[in-house]
C-alpha cells in the first residue's frame, strides 16, 4: 500500500493569471482541492517540494495528508500541469478522499513478461492496459497492480476476472476486460495447433 505523504500548503484568496504569476515568482505553485461534495479549496504549495514528489513513481495515486492552516485533509492528486520546457510543476488539482471507497487509476506492473512461457516460445507480449481504474478503501490504496505473467502461454489473453487485486480493492468496471495478450508470431505454433497437427499426422 502507498505510504501517506505529508505536505503543507497555504490557503489563497487571489485568483487569475496575474495572481498565479506572482505566486510562481515567490517559488510557490497554485493548486485546488475539490470533489466529494465539498466546497473547493484554493491553495498554494512550495514549488521545489511538489516538483520533487511529482517526479517520483506513482505520484498520481499517492495518498497525501495535506495540512492547510493547521487543518488536515486527506487528498489524492488528480491532474498536474507542467512547464512545457522545464517540466516544473505549475498547477495541481487534488480531490478530497471519499468517506468509504475512492475511484482511482493506478499503473499495472507485469512481472516476468520478458521470460513468460509464451515469449520463450517466440510469442510477443502485448500490453492492452497500462493503467486500470479501481475502487479502493481509502486506507488501502495501492501504488500499482502487480501481476506475475511468468506462466502465461502463447496465444492467450489475461482477463480481469483472473486478477487477484490488493485487499479492499475491486475493478471499477463490472464488465470483464483484457489486460494483456501473448501473440504468436508467424511460423510459431501454439500448443493447441501443435496437438491438432500431431493428431492429424497420426490419423494418416
From Swiss-Prot:
GO terms for biological process: translation. Keywords: Ribonucleoprotein, Ribosomal protein, RNA-binding, rRNA-binding. It comes from the Bacteria. GO terms for cellular component: cytosolic large ribosomal subunit. Pfam families: Ribosomal_L25p (PF01386), Ribosomal_TL5_C (PF14693). CDD domains: Ribosomal_L25_TL5_CTC. GO terms for molecular function: 5S rRNA binding; structural constituent of ribosome. This is one of the proteins that binds to the 5S RNA in the ribosome where it forms part of the central protuberance. PANTHER family: RIBOSOMAL PROTEIN L25/GLN-TRNA SYNTHETASE, ANTI-CODON-BINDING DOMAIN-CONTAINING PROTEIN, RIBOSOMAL PROTEIN L25_GLN-TRNA SYNTHETASE, ANTI-CODON-BINDING DOMAIN-CONTAINING PROTEIN. Part of the 50S ribosomal subunit; part of the 5S rRNA/L5/L18/L25 subcomplex. Contacts the 5S rRNA. Binds to the 5S rRNA independently of L5 and L18. Belongs to the bacterial ribosomal protein bL25 family. CTC subfamily. This is Large ribosomal subunit protein bL25. The gene is rplY.
Amino acid at each position: 500500500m502507498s505510504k501517506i505523504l505529508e505536505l503543507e500548503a497555504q490557503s489563497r484568496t487571489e485568483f487569475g493569471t496575474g495572481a498565479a504569476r506572482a505566486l510562481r515568482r515567490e517559488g510557490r505553485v497554485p493548486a485546488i482541492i475539490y470533489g466529494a461534495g465539498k466546497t473547493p479549496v484554493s491553495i498554494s504549495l512550495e514549488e521545489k517540494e511538489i516538483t520533487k514528489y511529482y517526479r517520483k513513481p506513482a505520484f498520481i495515486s499517492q495518498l497525501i495528508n495535506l495540512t492547510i492552516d493547521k487543518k488536515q485533509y486527506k487528498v489524492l492528486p488528480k491532474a498536474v500541469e507542467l512547464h512545457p520546457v522545464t517540466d516544473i510543476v505549475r498547477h495541481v488539482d487534488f480531490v478530497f478522499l471519499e468517506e468509504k471507497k475512492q475511484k482511482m487509476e493506478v499503473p499495472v506492473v507485469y512481472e516476468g513478461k520478458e521470460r513468460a512461457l509464451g515469449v520463450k516460445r517466440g510469442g510477443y507480449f502485448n500490453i492492452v492496459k497500462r493503467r486500470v481504474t479501481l475502487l479502493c478503501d481509502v486506507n488501502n490504496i495501492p501504488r500499482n497492480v502487480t501481476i506475475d505473467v511468468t506462466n502465461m502461454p502463447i496465444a492467450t489473453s489475461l482477463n480481469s476476472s483472473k486478477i487477484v487485486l490488493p485487499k479492499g480493492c475491486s475493478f471499477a468496471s463490472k464488465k470483464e476486460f483484457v489486460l494483456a495478450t501473448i501473440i504468436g508470431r508467424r511460423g510459431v505454433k501454439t500448443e493447441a495447433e501443435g496437438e491438432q497437427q500431431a493428431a492429424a499426422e497420426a490419423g494418416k
